[in-house]
Amino acid sequence: MDDNKRPLYLPFAGPAILEAPLINKGSAFSEEERIFFNLEGLVPYAIETIEEQASRAYDQFRSFNNDLDKHIYLRNIQDTNETLFYRLVQNNISEMMPIIYTPTVGLACERFSKNYRRNRGLFISYPNKDRIDDILNNSTRQKVKIIVVTDGERILGLGDQGIGGMGIPIGKLSLYTSCGGISPAYTLPITLDVGTDNPQLLEDPMYMGWRHPRIGGEEYAEFIEAFMQAVHVRWPDTLIQFEDFAQKNAMPILERYKDRYCCFNDDIQGTAAVAVGSLLAACKAAGTELNQQRIAFLGAGSAGCGIAEAIVAQMVSEGISDEQARTQVCMVDRWGLLLDNMPNLLPFQQKLAQKCTNIQNWSNFSDNISLLDVVNNTKPTVLIGVSGVPGLFTEEIIRAMHSHCARPIIFPLSNPTSRVEATPKDILHWTSGQALVATGSPFEPVVVDGETFEIAQCNNSFIFPGIGLGVLASGARHVSDAMLMASSRALAECSPLAIDGSGPLLPKLEDIHAVSKHIAFAVGKVAVEQGLTLPMSDEILQQSIEGNFWSPEYRRYKRTSF
């Protein structure tokens, strides 16, 4: 218990305290608190520390035989005692992050209605579109500073999960707290229930969402607009993170609101920021610069194109022209290499399509130019996978890349693990241990010729908690492209491999607090420089970061009245 902080004064007592996860301490209530708050007999006699509670909880966690059961167990602790939950997760971050988020959260989303136990967050359904203000006022969280919102249409690589997508905002906000020190009292997960086009859910008698095909067009746009306006009225200074919206909606929503409200899309911008940060670290480890790379993407959706645009921006900042940078980035999707004469390119794909004149001298390529064709003709030094289709980085492709690049940089980023384009084990064996690898999901270390390679997880959790902390600490009114670029550079500065030539490409999760604070400072500093917040010195910004960083410690309670 942190006795150095002033006590919290509570106006209620008895079972109500034990039912409030933000303030419940379970067996850690002191003797005085048990008397004053009418808790005697409601908890066992022994008074425990939070570490003793966490030790018991960890033993119980280890007793479960599969990851989904472990996920459900941890969520139950979160819904009864949030301070204990975050102490347990922080004590075992490497072991538990894959359980509370990817890859296990995908299965939890698929089984959300079947495994539903207790309410968390808000479900705003389309039939209630005229009562959004009332629904927001129903939240048990009154000082919301960060919202993660989804409509459940593109959950990881699993597609439309309807309200089951709520597992993603819950998981993401758990990482904001456990990695970025954001108080759970300031977080709110929201699912916009606009129906589902998943026939299995519509026919499932246990499905708990609105049984209706997804709305679209003007109805959808008006619903999103009503939601954004209502949130801004209720919590005008909150940061809104868009999560797992379908490709057709993700970019238009971001473009519509990024200059009106403090918001960002983690799938597009967060993924891009962590990918660029990892790429900068890999380039430094390989002894080269990003603007010298030739980059091939497999996957040209909003996430892939978001990464590509961030790479182009970083290349330009390193001194080459925008036009030149775009010639060094090739986007391949299911129809092959994106070319400027293709009739059905999406708006965000058009600027990344290669000019047909650029491939006139290519040799031995098919009608739909494949990834192998791109590798053989452009000789890329970087290969990034965001396709969501497993096994597409074949041995032939990887060996062809390695034949012209001594230290290829290969990032199979698709989630969950079952969707990865190639496993690190295969990539490292096909390149004799020379590839610099980062993945979107966690993988065990790989041994090649007696050397052990730790696999960096190019996970957004290295970026978005620091961005959120930086926005809160600085009071930024928007999330600018420059702030995101600063987060990438700050992450690269934390790379063990880039710093001393050994260790993993990205920091260990055990160092995530220091990484998040470093990123928060870089993000907040740019916000100050761009006039997106009030002027403040570096010293004041750093103090604000430390002051906003929450730790899972119990507080002393006093009763306001009897």
Curated annotation (Swiss-Prot):
User: What S-S linkages are listed for this chain?
Assistant: none
- A single BP term in Gene Ontology: malate metabolic process
| A single MF term (Gene Ontology) | oxaloacetate decarboxylase activity
Look up the domain of life of the source.
Answer: Bacteria
What is catalysed by this protein? (S)-malate + NAD(+) = pyruvate + CO2 + NADH; oxaloacetate + H(+) = pyruvate + CO2
Query: Mind telling me which SUPFAM superfamilies this protein's record contains?
Result: Aminoacid dehydrogenase-like, N-terminal domain (SSF53223), NAD(P)-binding Rossmann-fold domains (SSF51735)
Q: Which positions are annotated as binding NAD(+)?
A: R154, D267, N415
Q: How is the cofactor bound?
A: Divalent metal cations. Prefers magnesium or manganese.
Its needed co-factors are: Mg(2+); Mn(2+)
Q: Which Pfam families does the protein's record reference? A: malic (PF00390), Malic_M (PF03949)
Q: Which InterPro entries match?
A: Aminoacid_DH-like_N_sf (IPR046346), Malic_enzyme_CS (IPR015884), Malic_N_dom (IPR012301), Malic_N_dom_sf (IPR037062), Malic_NAD-bd (IPR012302), Malic_OxRdtase (IPR001891), NAD(P)-bd_dom_sf (IPR036291), NAD_malic_enz_proteobac (IPR023667)
Q: What keywords sit in the KW lines? A: Metal-binding, NAD, Oxidoreductase
An annotated GO cellular component of this protein is: cytosol
Where does the record place the catalytic residues?
Y101 (proton donor), K172 (proton acceptor)
Q: Which NCBIfam families match?
A: PRK13529.1 (NF010052)
Annotated family: Belongs to the malic enzymes family.
Record protein name field: NAD-dependent malic enzyme
